[in-house]
Amino acid sequence: MGELKEILKQRYHELLDWNVKAPHVPLSQRLKHFTWSWFACTMATGGVGLIIGSFPFRFYGLNTIGKIVYILQIFLFSLFGSCMLFRFIKYPSTIKDSWNHHLEKLFIATCLLSISTFIDMLAIYAYPDTGEWMVWVIRILYYIYVAVSFIYCVMAFFTIFNNHVYTIETASPAWILPIFPPMICGVIAGAVNSTQPAHQLKNMVIFGILFQGLGFWVYLLLFAVNVLRFFTVGLAKPQDRPGMFMFVGPPAFSGLALINIARGAMGSRPYIFVGANSSEYLGFVSTFMAIFIWGLAAWCYCLAMVSFLAGFFTRAPLKFACGWFAFIFPNVGFVNCTIEIGKMIDSKAFQMFGHIIGVILCIQWILLMYLMVRAFLVNDLCYPGKDEDAHPPPKPNTGVLNPTFPPEKAPASLEKVDTHVTSTGGESDPPSSEHESV
């Protein structure tokens, strides 16, 4: 009990104590370090709005709460956008730096994902109280989002592959971020299908399925790399483990998109992709596939939660970072997919489970918002040396695995491996005991 008390005391000083303020730095200088990761907050806020809009067990006023969250998201997005604009105008070099930085460029995806939730909530909260013009607004925003997210995805991965060479040791769940925005196109198509006429919905559904599949397959590739990292290197530092919830999002959102898109196809008149007698089969297949991949999302959710809690109750340092909003957004897909599966198979248990997890996420969001405000006010965020832009680039993977790099830049461990490979490709004497761990 004594050790547990000491750990909790340490966590209090790291996460809740207000008497740990760093030296004062003018706000204009702090905004130089206002990185893209701040949009993870608006991404999560939009996700909470989506959860509130999908709760199966509702009470009077819940829709009003959802609209308040929607307005809050718009306010925060405008505020963060203004801060980012100030940063780029005051410090023009940060425009290029933010794109070329090995970590910060990944978080540009959180800005796009915030916009995706904005479009989703237009259909939930704005469309019922507006006119025909909202149908056009949603459709135009959707196609703009599709184009921008795909361009970002391609260019982000190209820059990563071209400028940064990673090792298994540096594998991170954040690698999945660039594929998230195009993947969410399927979720948006499913969310807005009730607002669009059939002849327009068909094209939106095609793009949605296409990009949802793209996102899911790329996710599987990157997920495998991260699992290999866990096997060979172990889990990340406790402070970085909330990022593991990123693995929950793609399978959960894919299941959600399949069900919602199928429901839109079945309910449209005239029918799209289905006939009068085949709608029920489309619903069955989509639900079947959603359940098939839901298990992966549930496993990733449990693994991430256990890993974080195990790290929380250690003496390893634990400081809040904007990346902690990964607790929320990926799990939004898990909650909504669970609820929709429950509706399709008429299971109150599934719906109740999704509802409970959704309530927990709303509570987590409130706590994370508090931690974010506290971290900013005590100079733990948006402060020189404490944000993503201060992270050093990964060491290049060289030697045997990548002989195109100059030998003098090879990490020491790989240089040792390389000394035991002959010029003809054959192996020389086995390494000595001091190198056996390499």
UniProtKB/Swiss-Prot annotation:
Gene Ontology cellular-component terms listed: plasma membrane
Record PTM Phosphoserine, positions in chain: 413, 423, 428, 432-433, 437
Principal subcellular localisation of the protein: membrane
Record-annotated membrane-spanning stretches: 37-57, 65-85, 106-126, 140-160, 172-192, 205-225, 242-262, 288-308, 321-341, 353-373
Positions of the UniProt region annotated as Disordered: 390-438
Gene3D superfamilies, sorted: Voltage-dependent anion channel
Topology relative to the membrane: Multi-pass membrane protein
Keyword set, alphabetical order: Membrane, Phosphoprotein, Transmembrane, Transmembrane helix, Transport
MF terms (GO), sorted A to Z: malate transmembrane transporter activity; malate:proton symporter activity; malonate(1-) transmembrane transporter activity; succinate transmembrane transporter activity; succinate:proton symporter activity; transmembrane transporter activity
GO BP of this protein: malate import across plasma membrane; malonic acid import across plasma membrane; succinate import across plasma membrane
UniProt-listed PANTHER family: MALIC ACID TRANSPORT PROTEIN (PTHR31162:SF0), MALIC ACID TRANSPORT PROTEIN-RELATED (PTHR31162)
Family affiliation: Belongs to the tellurite-resistance/dicarboxylate transporter (TDT) family.
Function: Permease for malate and other C4 dicarboxylic acids.
Protein name: Malic acid transport protein
Natural source organism: Schizosaccharomyces pombe (strain 972 / ATCC 24843)
Taxonomic placement: Eukaryota, Fungi, Dikarya, Ascomycota, Taphrinomycotina
